[in-house]
Amino acid sequence: MVLLNALLLVVAMTAAANTVLSLAVGDTTRLAAIHGGDQMALYLDAGTPLVSQVLTADWEAGAEIDHGGEIWATEGYSVPIDRGVLAGRITDLQGRFNLNWLASDNAGPAQAAFERLIRLLGLDIRLGRAVTEHLRPGGPANPAPYYNRALPVTAPGGTIATIAELRRVPGMTEAAFDTLAPHVAALPLGTGLNVNTASAPVLAAVLPGAALRDAEKLLSERAAAPFASAGDFASRAGTILRREVAAGPAPRDFRVVSEYFAAALDVALDDQRQSRMIWLHRSLSSGTVTETYRMTLP
């Protein structure tokens, strides 16, 4: 399976490299006339089809399961382009705690799970409650901390589009954001958690009564044999926890396949560098990949 995945990745990257060259290099006269920064932006634009090819090849190899042992998750990639190199790495956003669960009408289980995650990460529980209030439908019960700033902001409540929104939460420092960010995502409300790619803190948070060591045992089991289904996860987690494992913090929670991914792209051209994050959706039924959001990184 590893060899098959590797071959599929090579095929995907070869096809994608041709696309990259076509998009980014095609008109050499035009490229010669533009600045290096503009040229790097073109190279980064070409990263989307590269990532799409890799994710589509993974879906074609097996659409029933996504896990951390697959090539897209374990290997970065780089493609030489003209005078530069485009590199990137893909992550599964469904392996993270979906903050928008906190905006549902029945958010009690999600709120409890999020508080457990905050504690497991060593963050102030008051910060966790402020995040929960930020996403509460209708907005925070006490909006004064938002209005009483040097530059007042609004907090309408409800779902958020990106986790960058967390920077508006009262008490959210850059250090706290950097600690929390790798474990959370902002996905559509009904999106489930892929238990094959979730971190130990996230798994411990969504399993009431589980300690971090229990989640780490699950990760060891998962490394040996990824969970084949939500039922398989519940059964194996139940054995470790010695109790029945329920659905989790939101409707249709536990899954073993993913739709939502992110990719960090980096291009080097001569002595210059430029980076971008892109967010993507991959159709469960067709494997078609669509870019949904992008952000240039400093």
Question: Residue locations for each model-derived region?
Answer:
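Compositionally biased linear targeting/interaction segments
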Residues: 1-298
